[in-house]
């Protein structure tokens, strides 16, 4: 019987197998940010275990509320900052060098095919786009990971999504993952690995693959994963070129990280991307999906473009292509948050920031901020946002606010129209 890509990663990292199908895995990296990690840090300090298993494998960033908005968030940042200094963690990214973790860490080359990664953050699944096993964990598992460099997981069950066809105009990776979540539901992949394969996936950039894997958790998945290929190699080449004689040699190595043809899946689901329209959410669950055409005319107060889902350079290009030459509706507040300083700088160099500003957007520093209603774009009660983020739970971006999830291009069209824009807007 063949093995899936994640089963192969488990085999390569297993240090112990426990009763009940639990596997203790060696970790290649533990990622940390200032909201969840301080809880683990304080607990370890109280136990007299203020140390890390390997400082070179810890990557930490202050990203959720930066700069700090109040004493509480300042204290969270201080706990992480002081811990990083005490434990000689060199890869710590403070204000000025920081970005949204799930964009910054891949950009820095910290994610490699076949690696194992944990973080106290549910969207750690983003990094599966590189052919890694990456999962969000709770405080106890995070503490063990920091201290011992291991983490326990159940035997992985996988769902295979075979994506064929091509995107029509105005459709992007965000629409694809919204379509999938809409079909299987928020519990449709619970405790599963969502494995994305097929000709459409092969054609996607790393930015788009990260968007897909980022939202796997919204279907209940432990993680998402794509097979590494030459697109992966090209993205990582500045960081791996000393280890390989050529890109072809790197590809030959990474090409082993695919599922065998006779792998056993919990489910195999075929998706024709050609059938997908621009999509958005309604109500307060990410599986409540309607076409933008059906939702056309729904008034919005704010449009937010950014986050670990859609704050990368490709996303900014897609939105700017729609915005150029237009101004956003007078009643709309437009907020752009490039996910990292490098993305911000590249957007400046390409003239994208000017497009957003000319259209009427305010541009913030890289931060999670508005996505979880912590800063830089919190909604008032009764307000409605069009957002490129990943969650639309009740109160997610502010108590009593409504969030409609969508692609950056759809968000840009919505900002100009002043209401959720139907797909013909892209053809205008």
Residue ranges, per PLM feature:
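Fe-S-dependent hydro-lyases/dehydratases of central metabolism
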Residues: 1-428
């Amino acid at each position: 019987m063949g093995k899936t890509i994640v089963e192969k990663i488990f085999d390569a990292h297993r240090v112990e197998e426990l009763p009940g199908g639990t596997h203790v895995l060696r970790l290649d990296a533990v990622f940390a940010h200032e909201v969840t990690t301080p809880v683990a840090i304080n607990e370890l300090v109280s136990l007299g275990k203020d140390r890390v298993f390997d400082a070179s494998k810890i990557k930490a960033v202050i990203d959720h509320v930066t700069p700090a908005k109040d004493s509480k968030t300042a204290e969270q940042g201080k706990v992480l900052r002081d811990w990083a200094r005490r434990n000689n963690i060199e890869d710590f990214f403070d204000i000025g060098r920081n970005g949204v973790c799930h964009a910054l860490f891949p950009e820095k080359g910290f994610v490699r095919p076949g690696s194992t990664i944990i973080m106290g953050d549910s969207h750690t699944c983003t990094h599966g786009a590189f052919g890694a096993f990456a999962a969000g964990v709770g405080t106890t598992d995070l503490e063990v990971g920091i201290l011992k460099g291991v983490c326990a997981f159940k035997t992985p069950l996988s769902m295979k999504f075979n994506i064929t066809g091509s995107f029509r105009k105005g459709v992007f990776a965000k629409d694809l993952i919204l379509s999938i979540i809409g079909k299987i539901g928020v519990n449709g992949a619970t405790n599963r690995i969502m494995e994305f394969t097929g000709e459409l996936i092969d054609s996607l950039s790393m930015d788009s693959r990260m968007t897909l894997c980022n939202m796997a958790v919204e279907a209940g998945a432990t993680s998402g994963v794509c097979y590494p290929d030459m697109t992966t190699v090209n993205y990582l080449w500045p960081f791996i070129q000393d280890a390989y004689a050529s890109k072809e040699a790197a590809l030959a190595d990474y090409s082993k990280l695919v599922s065998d043809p006779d792998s056993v899946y919990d489910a195999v689901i075929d998706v024709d991307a050609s059938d997908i329209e621009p999509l958005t959410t309604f109500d307060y669950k990410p599986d409540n999906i309607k076409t933008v055409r059906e939702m056309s005319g729904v008034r919005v107060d704010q449009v937010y473009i950014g986050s670990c889902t859609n704050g990368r350079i490709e996303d900014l290009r897609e939105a700017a292509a729609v915005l150029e030459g237009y101004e956003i509706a007078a009643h709309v507040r437009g907020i752009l948050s490039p996910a990292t300083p490098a993305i911000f700088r590249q957007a400046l160099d390409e003239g994208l920031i000017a497009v957003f500003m000319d259209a009427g957007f305010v541009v913030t520093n890289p931060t999670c901020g508005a996505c979880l209603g912590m800063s830089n774009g919190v909604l008032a009660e009764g307000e409605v946002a069009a957002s490129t983020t990943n969650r639309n739970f009740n109160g997610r971006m502010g108590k009593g606010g409504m969030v409609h999830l969508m692609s950056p291009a759809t968000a840009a069209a919505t900002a100009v129209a002043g209401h959720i824009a139907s797909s013909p807007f892209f053809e205008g």
